[in-house]
Structure formats: C-alpha cells, structure tokens
C-alpha cells in the first residue's frame, strides 16, 4: 500500500492548506489507535455466539426452501442476510483459529453439519417443485419383471384375444380372426370377450316382433298400428282427450284470444272422438279432414258463411255455451281470422249484409253474422255503432291483431247506425296488396235489397304501370261500415292510371272528402268516389254537430279505414269507375288549395299538398304529383310577388 501525499486528494486534486493539516492529524491519530481498534473488534467477535449464527442461517434456509409456503422475505434479502451471517461466522473462525484451536475445531463441525442440512433441504425442495411441473407421460416406466410360472393364466387373455391397443377403438364389424382365437379357450373358463371390451350392437334391420311386443307397452312403439297407439295415448279417457285437444289448440286459443267456451266445445267434441277412437281406432287427422269437408259442404249449401269447426257438434249446444260467457271484440276478430264461428255475443259486433258477400267465399262468415244480427237482434243504434267500430274482416293482415280497446261513441246522427270515435293512435300497419284472383268483395252501388249501411268500398288495386310501393288501402284492424272519426292513416291515395304515385314525403291525405253526389238508391251517402282519401289529421277529430246528417256522414267517411285486403271483381271496371271522379274533383278545386298553402308557406319551405279550410265545403286535392305541387307553388309565388 503506497503512501499518498497529504497535499492532494485521492483523485490527485490539490487540497487547501487547512485541509492538508487536518488530514495529517487524522493519520497520526489512526496510527496511535490501531491496536486499540483491533482489540475492540476482537472483543465484539468474542461476544457473538457462533451457534446462534448457525441457527439463524438454518432459519433462513427453511424459509427459502419451503415448498408449501412462499418465503416472507425476498430472495435477494435472504441472500444478503445469509452472506452477512456467513462472513461473521468466518471471522469468528479466524479469531479462534489463532487464539483457541479447540474451539475452532468445534465450530468447524457445526459448519459441516449445517451444510449437510442445507443440502437436504434444497434437494427436497427441488424434488417437490419438479414433481409439480413434471408430466406423467415423461416419467419412464420400470421394466416389467418376468411373471412367475405358478400364476394361473385362465383369466388372462392371450395375445390373440387382447385388443391391439388401449388407444384404438376397434369396430364390432371387424375381421373375425380375434373371435376365432378365443374359441379354443371357451372350455377353460376364459370369457368370450376380453375385459373392457363391449359386445357388438344389435344387427341391422327392424327388431323382431317379440321385442316389439315386449317393449310396445313401455315405449309405445308398435310397428303395425302407430296411429292407433297415438290415439290410445291421446284419447284413452275423456280427460286425456280434453287435454290432448286443448294442447293441440293451446297456441291459437291462447295467443289469438280464443274464448274459453271454444275450449269447452272442443272438450265435448273430444269426448265424442275418444269414444269413437277406442272403437274403430281411426286417426284424428282423418276424422278432422272428413269433418272439415262435410262442414264445408254444409256451409256452401247454407250460403251464409264458413263455419270451420274442429269437430262435428250440434249448433244448439254451441249456442248455449256461447251465451255463458261474453266475447270481447278482439276475441271475435281473432275467431274470424282463424275461421271459427262467432258466438252470439260476438254476433252483435257484425255490420255486414248477406247480399254484399254472395260471391265472396273467404269473407262470407262475417256477413252471415251480419245477416243474423239484422234479422234476429233488435239492438239500438248506439249498441250497433259501438260494436261496428270493434269489428274487422277476417282477411285483415297480421298487423291488425293488436287493436285498441273500444271507446264509447256519440249518438247516431241518422237512422243507420253511425260508428263512434276511433281510439286515437297511429294506424296499425299497411295492409297487404290485393292477391291475384282475390274473391269478390264489392257490389254495384245501386243494388236493391241492401239492409243496413253499405260497408265502405275497398280501394282499387294498383293500376297497370304503377311502380311498386305500399299497397293502397287503409291500415288493417278497423271496421268496414260507416267509417268512424279518428286520426288519419298516413297512406297516400291510390293513383289513377297514367299518373305516377306521389312520394310519401310530398303529400298527405286531404283534410275533407269530396262532396260528390251519392250514388242513387243508397242511404247513407255512398262511399267516397276516391277510396284512397282515407282520413284527416287529428285536428279534425271533433266536427261541429250543427252539420246536417249528410255532411256529418261524409265527414265521418273521410276518416274511415277498413281493414280487409282490396278485393275487386273486375279490376278494370272498378278502377275506371272511380278515376274520373277523382280527377274531376282534383282539377276543379286545384285553386282552392292555394289558400291553405299560402297560409302555411311561412311555416314550411317545402311545398306540401294542403287541404281546404275545415269549415268550408271545398273539396281537397286527392292525388297530386310533383308537377301539380310545383304549379301550385308557382301560382302562390306569383300572387305574393
């Protein structure tokens, strides 16, 4: 160790004279105290117990090599602690090596024992940790020792009888060589199949009749009479028959709103069916087919309407059961949609007449009920009016299944029953377009013998050349008959041939219907010449009652909607019947629409087909194209400029 100059630091930097003097004094002091300091260090080492140091190191090892619990201290901290303890123990060894060799030998034995214990702990810890991460497949299996000769090999399958591998699934239809090797061993007690092998499945083909008879009662499988078995399961007793029929009809009777009396009728029908089915073992499907055919023939002979029932049942008991429970209008509508016969309570809802439906085979059921209502029931006009609102033809679209609840209407304004207010709300949806070959629904307006009000004529189908779009006609779910007042359906009226239909955003239905002359021989006035003018906006729900009966009825017809598919007997004749009236009304009153347009011009910058004032008798424009709207707009601008 070389001597450094006192005039510079360790790095060679020059020191101040004061610092140089202090450094020299310190050196002299250290030289004097070196012996004393060495004696102090030796005394401190002698005060320490080497056995306690060994025990501390063992605790650290147990903490480090514990396979169950993670060490509380970090691995680096454990190493530092062990290092310090080890250095201290080594200094003690050096101290006693010089001063007391006997103690030095004892301390060496303690150190060797400690190292052995630490090695065992480390080995155990590594074994446990490796066992947790090792894979079973990687462990080598020991060699199998030779089996002693005194073991009986009766139950041990020979190599020819044992499966080739435990990982392969051999087929039951494999080569029979394995079975042949087993055959000589059958007499010696060897099982036919080796342990773990499953016998092959049943042979292909239908099971023998003995098996069928054995399991026929449990499983219900009979090869010769499956319909009879199904009938016995369903219709073994009247209770089971009722349950079976109710289960068959549960989806329609519950979802479509069938009344409970229909279920009672089905119960009576099913009890009769159960008696007959037990005797002749016919299937329900055949009986229902025969019953529907016979009932269809009966209803065609009656010419009063279809009455599709699910079993033949006398009408008297059916009427008795129907009088037991009231039928809501929604249930009556659903019954008609499903083709069921309407009970007596539901017949009060009908407004159809028989003469209108002489040619209609699909819609004749509702008109049959209307005829019975006019002949048998002498209800007041208000009752008929309230019920007229709640009915819908059976051909209504599925969107009409959700109908608003009935509301009490105003007193009738004339001898024919007038419908009440329609519940406010948006239209229930667009009706489907007229199907090709739809059954006739319309009659000539002047046909004699009409009893009660003529239902509102259906709009004509789409004329030839019209681009595809929403089909004309009112939304489903509203009564045919004199239309009730209410918010309008947002449907454009059907366009005549040659005029493209207006876009939905460019026009609204007019507010007031045209006051054209009614066809002769009708009371109340005939339906609108243009059946597309369906309704008015909600501002015209309340009309002044000072109007005469004719005006009030026509005003109500403006807001009417009917919920049947458009059905036309002669499309060309029916379409051309209404076209000239609609065109004439539009051309005569084109100037009358300028007043509301000019009045609302400041509110909306887009020209829209407005309607005439509410109280005036002027007729609104029924069909307007872009050219008509633009022409009216230019006239307004000329008047303003």
Swiss-Prot record:
Entry-annotated residues carrying N6-acetyllysine: 13, 565
Modified residues (Omega-N-methylarginine): 192
UniProt-annotated location(s): Nucleus; Cytoplasm
Biased composition, class Basic residues, residue ranges: 28-37
Modified residues (Phosphoserine): 181, 237, 279, 283, 353, 361, 364, 600
UniProt GO BP: mRNA processing; RNA splicing; rRNA processing
Region described as Required for nuclear import: spans on this chain: 1-45
Keywords, ordered alphabetically: Acetylation, Coiled coil, Cytoplasm, Isopeptide bond, Methylation, mRNA processing, mRNA splicing, Nucleus, Phosphoprotein, rRNA processing, Ubl conjugation
GO molecular function, one term: protein phosphatase regulator activity
Keyword Cell membrane: no
Residue ranges with Polar residues bias: 1-11
UniProt main location, coarse: nucleus
Top-rank lineage group of the source organism: Eukaryota
Outcome of swapping residue 308 to A: Impairs interaction with PP1
Coiled coil location: 75-133
Cross-link (Glycyl lysine isopeptide (Lys-Gly) (interchain with G-Cter in SUMO2)): 557, 572
Effect of loss of the gene: Mutant embryos die prior to 8.5 dpc. Heterozygous null mice are small and exhibit defects in axial skeleton, kidneys and esophagus.
InterPro entries: WW_dom-bd_prot_11
Entry-annotated residues carrying Phosphotyrosine: 236
Composition bias, Pro residues: 192-210, 405-447, 456-504, 510-530
Effect ascribed to mutating residue 310 to A: Impairs interaction with PP1
UniProt short sequence motif PGR, positions renumbered to this chain: 455-466
Annotated region (Interaction with PP1), positions in chain: 217-221, 306-310
Function in brief: Activates pre-mRNA splicing. May inhibit PP1 phosphatase activity.
Protein name: WW domain-binding protein 11
Organism: Mus musculus
């Amino acid at each position: 160790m070389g001597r450094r100059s006192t005039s510079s630091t360790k790095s060679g930097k020059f020191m101040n004279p004061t610092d140089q003097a202090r450094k020299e004094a310190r050196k002299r002091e250290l030289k004097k105290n070196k012996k004393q300091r060495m004696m102090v260090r030796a005394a401190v080492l002698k005060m320490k117990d080497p056995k306690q140091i060994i025990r501390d190191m063992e605790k650290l090892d147990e903490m480090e090599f514990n396979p169950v619990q993670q060490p509380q201290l970090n691995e680096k901290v454990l190493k530092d602690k062990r290092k310090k303890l080890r250095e201290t123990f080594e200094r003690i060894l050096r101290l006693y090596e010089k001063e007391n060799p006997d103690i030095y030998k004892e301390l060496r034995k303690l150190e060797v024992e400690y190292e052995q214990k630490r090695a065992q702990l480390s080995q155990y810890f590594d074994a446990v940790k490796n066992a947790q991460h090792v894979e079973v497949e990687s462990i080598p299996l020991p060699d199998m020792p030779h089996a002693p000769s005194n073991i009986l090999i009766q139950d041990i399958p020979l190599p020819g009888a044992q499966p080739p591998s435990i990982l392969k699934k051999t087929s039951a239809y494999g080569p029979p060589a394995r079975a042949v090797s087993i055959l000589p061993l059958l007499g010696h007690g060897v099982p036919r199949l080796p342990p773990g092998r499953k016998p092959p499945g049943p042979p292909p083909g239908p099971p023998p009749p003995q098996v069928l008879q054995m399991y026929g009662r449990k499983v219900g499988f009979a090869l010769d009479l499956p319909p009879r078995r199904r009938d016995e399961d369903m219709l073994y007793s009247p209770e089971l028959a009722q349950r079976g029929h109710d289960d068959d009809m549960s989806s329609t009777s519950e979802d479509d709103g069938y009344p409970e009396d229909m279920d009672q009728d089905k119960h009576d029908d099913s009890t009769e069916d159960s008696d007959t089915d037990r005797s002749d073992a016919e299937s329900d499907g055949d009986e229902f087919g025969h019953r529907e055919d016979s009932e269809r023939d009966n209803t065609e002979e009656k010419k009063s309407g279809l009455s599709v029932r699910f079993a033949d049942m006398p009408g008297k008991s059916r009427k008795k059961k129907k009088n037991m429970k009231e039928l809501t209008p929604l249930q009556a509508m659903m019954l008609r949609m499903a083709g069921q016969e309407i009970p007596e309570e539901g017949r009060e809802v009908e407004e159809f007449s028989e003469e209108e439906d002489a040619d209609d085979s699909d819609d004749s059921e509702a008109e049959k009920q209307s005829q019975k209502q006019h002949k048998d029931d002498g209800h007041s006009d208000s009752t008929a009016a309230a019920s007229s609102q709640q009915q819908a033809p059976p051909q209504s679209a599925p969107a009409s299944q959700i109908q608003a609840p009935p509301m009490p209407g105003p007193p009738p304004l004339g001898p024919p029953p007038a419908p009440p207010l329609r519940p406010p709300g948006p239209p229930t949806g667009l009706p489907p377009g007229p199907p090709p070959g739809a059954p006739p629904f319309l009659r000539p307006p002047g046909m004699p013998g009409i009893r009660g009000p003529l239902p509102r004529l259906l709009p004509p189908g789409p004329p030839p050349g019209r681009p595809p779009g929403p089909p004309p006609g009112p939304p489903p779910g509203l009564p045919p008959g004199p239309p009730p007042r209410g918010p309008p359906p947002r449907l454009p009226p059907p366009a005549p041939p040659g005029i493209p239909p207006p876009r939905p955003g460019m026009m609204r239905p007019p507010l007031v219907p045209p006051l054209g002359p009614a066809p002769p021989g009708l009371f109340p006035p005939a339906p609108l010449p243009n059946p597309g003018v369906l309704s008015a906006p909600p501002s015209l729900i309340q009309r002044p009652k000072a109007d005469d009966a004719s005006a009030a009825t026509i005003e109500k017809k403006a807001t009417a909607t009917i919920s049947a598919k458009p059905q036309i007997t002669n499309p060309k004749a029916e379409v051309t019947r209404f076209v000239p009236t609609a065109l004439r009304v539009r051309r005569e009153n084109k100037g009358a629409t300028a007043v509301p347009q000019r009045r609302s011009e400041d509110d909306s910058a887009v020209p829209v087909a407005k309607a005439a004032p509410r109280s005036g008798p002027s007729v609104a424009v029924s069909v307007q194209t872009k050219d008509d709207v633009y022409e009216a707009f230019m006239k307004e601008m000329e008047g303003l400029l």
